[in-house]
């Protein structure tokens, strides 16, 4: 799994239909202070990756304390998460100018894992709002910092836990 995490003061998502207008079947989602995360899944990802990544995000100390040091977690500040499924995080651009997405998980698996991952985040007591899997979305956010961190379970998880 791969996540691009951005610390935000606010973020929102709308779904766009095939006509290029807002999809009336999707209720726009918005959050206040917290994280906007783009989540990519591979076919090799499973429960171990979900558990490790959710724990890492819930406990990541990237919010300032009273002294201005990044010393507080999203749980500490009572923040929220906006989670967006994003298969393009696994783009391969080695050949030519057109990205290949062969490393991205198959849609059925990726959707299931993304939902399960968001549930793991919620179990940590943090409200999680979501986009719609596979949809064309418009995501808006106000970066706070900016603080942007890429977490990749393939490279960042300790060897014994993969």
From Swiss-Prot:
Q: What is its EC number?
A: 3.1.1.96
Entry superkingdom:
Bacteria
Q: Which GO terms describe its cellular component?
A: cytoplasm
Q: Where is this motif: Gly-cisPro motif, important for rejection of L-amino acids?
A: 145-146
Q: Kindly state which keywords UniProt assigns to this record, in alphabetical order.
A: Cytoplasm, Hydrolase, RNA-binding, tRNA-binding
One of the GO BP terms on file: D-amino acid catabolic process
Query: Which Pfam families does the protein's record reference?
Result: Tyr_Deacylase (PF02580)
Reactions it catalyzes: glycyl-tRNA(Ala) + H2O = tRNA(Ala) + glycine + H(+); a D-aminoacyl-tRNA + H2O = a tRNA + a D-alpha-amino acid + H(+)
Q: Where in the cell is it found?
A: Cytoplasm
SS bond list: none
* GO terms assigned for molecular function: D-tyrosyl-tRNA(Tyr) deacylase activity; Gly-tRNA(Ala) deacylase activity; Ser(Gly)-tRNA(Ala) hydrolase activity; tRNA binding
Family according to the record: Belongs to the DTD family.
The subunit structure is:
Homodimer.
The domain-related comment in the record is: A Gly-cisPro motif from one monomer fits into the active site of the other monomer to allow specific chiral rejection of L-amino acids.
Q: What does this protein do?
A: An aminoacyl-tRNA editing enzyme that deacylates mischarged D-aminoacyl-tRNAs. Also deacylates mischarged glycyl-tRNA(Ala), protecting cells against glycine mischarging by AlaRS. Acts via tRNA-based rather than protein-based catalysis; rejects L-amino acids rather than detecting D-amino acids in the active site. By recycling D-aminoacyl-tRNA to D-amino acids and free tRNA molecules, this enzyme counteracts the toxicity associated with the formation of D-aminoacyl-tRNA entities in vivo and helps enforce protein L-homochirality.
Name of the protein described by the UniProt record: D-aminoacyl-tRNA deacylase
- Provide the species name: Bifidobacterium longum (strain DJO10A)
Q: Taxonomic lineage per UniProt?
A: Bacteria, Bacillati, Actinomycetota, Actinomycetes, Bifidobacteriales
């Amino acid at each position: 799994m791969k996540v691009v995490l951005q610390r935000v003061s606010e973020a929102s998502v709308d779904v766009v239909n095939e006509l290029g207008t807002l999809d009336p079947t999707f209720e726009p989602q918005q959050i206040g202070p917290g994280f906007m995360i783009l989540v990519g899944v591979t076919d090799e990802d499973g429960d171990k990756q979900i558990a490790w990544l959710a724990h890492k995000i819930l406990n990541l100390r990237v919010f300032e304390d009273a002294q201005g040091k990044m010393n507080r977690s999203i749980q500490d500040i009572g923040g929220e998460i906006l989670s967006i499924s994003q298969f393009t995080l696994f783009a391969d651009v080695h050949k030519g100018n057109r990205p290949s997405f062969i490393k991205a998980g198959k849609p059925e698996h990726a959707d299931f894992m993304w939902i399960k991952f968001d549930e793991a985040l919620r179990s940590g007591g943090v409200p999680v709002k979501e986009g719609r899997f596979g949809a064309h979305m418009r995501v808006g956010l106000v970066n706070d910092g900016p603080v942007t961190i890429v977490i990749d379970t393939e490279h960042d998880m300790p060897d014994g836990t993969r």
